[in-house]
Amino acid sequence: METIKRTKIVDVLKSDAFGTTVNVKGWVRTRRGSKQVNFIALNDGSTINNVQIVVDVDKLGDEFLKPITTGASISVNGILTQSQGKGQSVEIQATEIEIFGTADPATYPLQKKGHSMEFLREIAHLRPRTNTFGAVFRIRHNMAYAIHKFFHDRGFFYFHTPIITASDCEGAGQMFQVTTKNLYDLKKDENGSIIYEDDFFGKQASLTVSGQLEGELAATALGQIYTFGPTFRAENSNTPRHLAEFWMIEPEVAFNDITDNMELAEEFIKYCVQWALDNCMEDIKFLNDMFDKELIARLEGVLKDSFVRLPYTEGIKILEEAVAKGHKFEFPVYWGVDLASEHERFLVEDHFKRPVILTDYPKEIKAFYMKQNEDGKTVRAMDVLFPKIGEIIGGSEREADYDKLMTRIDELGIPMKDMWWYLDTRRFGTVPHSGFGLGFERLLLFVTGMANIRDVIPFPRTPNNAEF
């Protein structure tokens, strides 16, 4: 086979260099035709669209073509021509074909038919070859690029925080432990507590639940930073919105108050949505047509108006009024409750009909590091609530006063020995600062319109599932 430099299918489909010889490589979506001519739909992952390969059966031979079935991988040399058929502007008249690998139709699971999301999760190693997951993962790439670009263009520094940590940012204790010890022969003291001094790190260590605390340290030196990395929560939650392993984006900015924080969060998420519409429209349109007919309208909708700023207390009043008028929620509504997704979505979808930034939460349901308001009951927290998703961003102005932070840590019984390094930033040149966390997969749920968070990450980690 003549050696010709490969052209990606996304570029072939845009080309008007008719009459030239091109080479494409990819995986066969379908092969159909007659005794005289075959049509191969070929895809290489660079685009949702296939290129049509027109094959003269007499020239290449029927026996040669038989192994070219759905899932087979091939290389094609051919003449680029204008297509006479519907659905494509160009096609390739094949002159040579090389078969890299075959896919037995009797065992290859991705035949030309519909597959359930549950089935595709069982073959997560193959599902990127489907149109749906090709689209999702191209969008995932573009969203990651947009995030880095947003912060880089605004002078933020990308800061790497540790995956293995001895601190629990959220204070929930739901962490995956890291050890090199034999779990069946752990040394314990007279009280039955495990002795960690002779473990690898000399202390109890876990996978991080957040890079925020370390990010705060960086912000008090570099001014404005962001983290973007994997986080881990050992929550036994089998819901369409939870993963045990996911990715978080966490900016932290010195000298920013809660108002600055809200403005940054709104600017950031609108930028990401606009980037998706500008750069991923083919894939978004496919997902809109296949899964969620309101996807594009919903994406465009969040860009139209400013997000509502709503104190938690006012939000509770709105929800209580809805209950009084007959609206039924599964979970109760009262001041002090940590709002459920149904409450958040009611505020966004039914009441305001646009994104809401809920602020000033009761301190009892928020983390120790959040700055308290003068009322002594609430903290300067903020959650960005989105249609279909509920909470998509959570953040706050951080407590910058050493004594107040010490008091709060003591109230919650957090061991001081684990927090000395964090407290040093309040002892030495403390400054007001704020930040937030965006769950990357929740952003992707919104942008793709997918219904389950397991379908926007390549290899989902959930209770009882750690395949691949």
Curated annotation (Swiss-Prot):
Please list every transmembrane segment annotated in the UniProt record, as residue ranges.
none
The Swiss-Prot or TrEMBL record describes its family as follows: Belongs to the class-II aminoacyl-tRNA synthetase family.
Residues of the signal peptide: none
Q: Which organism is it from?
A: Parabacteroides distasonis (strain ATCC 8503 / DSM 20701 / CIP 104284 / JCM 5825 / NCTC 11152)
GO-annotated cellular components: cytoplasm
Which UniProt key words apply to this protein?
Aminoacyl-tRNA synthetase, ATP-binding, Cytoplasm, Ligase, Nucleotide-binding, Protein biosynthesis
Quaternary structure per UniProt? Homodimer.
**What is the protein's name according to its record?**
Asparagine--tRNA ligase
- Show the GO MF annotations: asparagine-tRNA ligase activity; ATP binding; nucleic acid binding
Q: Which Pfam families match?
A: tRNA-synt_2, tRNA_anti-codon
